[in-house]
């Protein structure tokens, strides 16, 4: 079974770009460990092609080379925070909510039409950080779009924003999971990886 991780820096996480079997040091690494533990006798091929800084339009532009030609059995997509993040700062790029929806829909539609992959959509998230409150407000308008598209196209939806909100009720320090509210540290990456493995377990089981 071939499982492809796609997305931005949260997926990239320092992976070796010369070796797409290198999982990097983020959630894919921990997801792979958890999946192998759940299915010790299964034959898996894990590929990580996340690229740091990517927005939805950039992922669409490389979708043929970095997904369709690979023909994964399962593809996971965690994308969107940069579409919001890049609205701010000196080199800001304005992606409207309408453009975001069109880009993300185009990604999912093309995957559905040109692969047989099961699609896992992971919601973007932003942990509470005072310096990022405007970004968080913008993210609130993006998340319903992701949920809507996941209902239309995804086989599994992981509401990571909601999952983190629940987790922070028992571990109320966002810094435990991330130093900047976006990029997970080792604790955050392990948490996301284990959440991922739990959510895709039934999907994997039914496709072995």
Q: Each predicted region: which residue ranges?
A:
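Catalytic His-Asp segment of secreted/periplasmic serine-dependent ester chemistry enzymes
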Residues: 125-208
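Proline-aspartate-enriched helix->loop->beta-strand connector
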Residues: 67, 71-77, 81
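Structural recognition of the beta-strand scaffold that forms the well-ordered cores
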Residues: 3-5, 45-48, 74-78, 119-123, ...
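Serine-esterase "nucleophile elbow" of acetyl-processing enzymes
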Residues: 1-52, 57, 62-71
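Surface-exposed cleft-lining segments at the edges of enzyme active sites
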Residues: 49-51, 55, 84-99, 129-134
């Amino acid at each position: 079974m071939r499982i492809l991780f796609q997305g931005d820096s949260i997926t990239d996480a320092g992976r070796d770009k010369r070796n797409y079997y290198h999982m990097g040091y983020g959630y894919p690494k921990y997801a792979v460990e958890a999946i192998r533990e759940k299915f010790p006798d299964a034959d898996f091929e894990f590929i990580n092609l996340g690229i740091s800084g990517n927005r939805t339009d950039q992922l669409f532009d490389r979708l043929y080379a970095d997904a369709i030609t690979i023909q994964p059995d399962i593809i996971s997509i965690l994308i969107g925070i940069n579409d919001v993040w890049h609205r701010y700062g000196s080199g800001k790029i304005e992606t409207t909510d309408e453009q975001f929806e069109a880009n993300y829909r185009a990604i999912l539609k093309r995957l559905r039409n040109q692969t047989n992959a099961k699609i896992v959509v992971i919601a973007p998230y932003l942990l509470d950080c005072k310096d990022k409150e405007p970004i968080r407000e913008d993210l609130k308008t993006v998340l319903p779009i992701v949920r809507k598209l996941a209902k239309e196209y995804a086989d599994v939806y992981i509401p990571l924003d909601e999952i983190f909100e629940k987790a922070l009720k028992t571990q109320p320090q966002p810094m435990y999971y991330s130093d900047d509210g976006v990029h997970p540290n080792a604790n955050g990456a392990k948490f996301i990886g284990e959440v991922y493995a739990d959510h895709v377990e039934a999907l994997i089981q039914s496709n072995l």
